[in-house]
Amino acid sequence: MNRFLLEKPVPMKGPERAAPARIHPTAGSPEQWLEGCTVTFDFFVDWSCGRVQPDLWLKRLIQPGVNRTPPALPELLDALRRVDGDLERYRRFALNHGFSPSCILFDDTQDWNDENALLYRLELLPHGEELISLTLGQIKQEINRLSGGTVKIGSKGLKISASRLESALACTSSLWPGDADGILLKKGTDEPLAVLEYRKHTLSGSPTSVKRYYDSGADKRKYDRICLLRDRISPRIPVVVITYPIRAEESDVLFEKIQAGVSRRQLTVEDSRHCMLEAGKMDISRFKHTLNSLL
């Protein structure tokens, strides 16, 4: 029998997932510049009361062409560690801050119009793990429960998706939850230092402030939920939005420390910095120094 293998989802353009999402062709992206410094996950906001739920989901895809049934826990955990390295960092961060972390595992080649399509939830408990199988119908019910009701895609539509499942759910009233791009952790202690959001600058010229898009209403809920997550983790840490170019000829990376949230009704940029690419490359130490100057 083939070995059970997992892989990280790859962001792709649009609901059809026709091409990989663009990043800067030579410099890469903040995910690469901060590799090993952050944790990321999907999270829920109950919009009936504006509260971040304790449930965190980390999605991983079962590689097609291999055994699709999860093995015994030791082998399953080994498969996750081969993909994620220090899986315990995610568990440790979540449990230390009152969250309930899980890994959601699924074969993304399934027919997502079939309510009986199978997914697996690996619950990471303080002293062990528990694996639960769920149908697509049950996952949709869970999404609605944790979101405080039905939840649909906004007016901008789905521009980037990390799986065929997310694309399928974007056409329903059980939208897959959004993610935290990165929780920056202090080396050695895993103390949270900031909540990070990554924005792509797709046009020519200098990047535009996130405030412009928030005030237009198009991205309001996205930044409100990020600030709600920050408040849930620690009101003392900042939210930093990092806007980076994807055009080869552009080099300006914009950092903005923001405040937003449903109770504030507006987004405020408290401080900002710029960091430039050099010859199409990012000096990672300079990037980190610029980020740290906002913390």
Q: Which residue ranges define each predicted feature?
A:
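Conserved catalytic cores of phosphodiester-cleaving nucleases, focusing on short active-site segments
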Residues: 34-84, 180-184, 190-207
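Well-ordered, non-membrane alpha-helical segments in soluble/globular domains
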Residues: 73-90, 214-225, 280, 284-287
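Short His-Asn-centered micro-motif
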Residues: 106-107, 178, 185, 198, ...
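Acidic-basic catalytic patches of nuclease active cores, encompassing PD-(D/E)XK
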Residues: 1-50, 93-100, 106-178, 293-295
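Charged, low-complexity, helix-prone segments enriched in Lys/Glu/Asp/Gln
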Residues: 19-24, 200-203, 262
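Nucleic-acid nuclease catalytic cores
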Residues: 88-117, 224-260
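Acidic, metal/cofactor-coordinating or nucleic-acid-engaging core segments within structured domains
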Residues: 82-85, 153-167, 172-175, 205-247
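Active-site or metal-binding loop neighborhoods of secreted/extracellular toxin and effector enzymes
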Residues: 113-137, 253-295
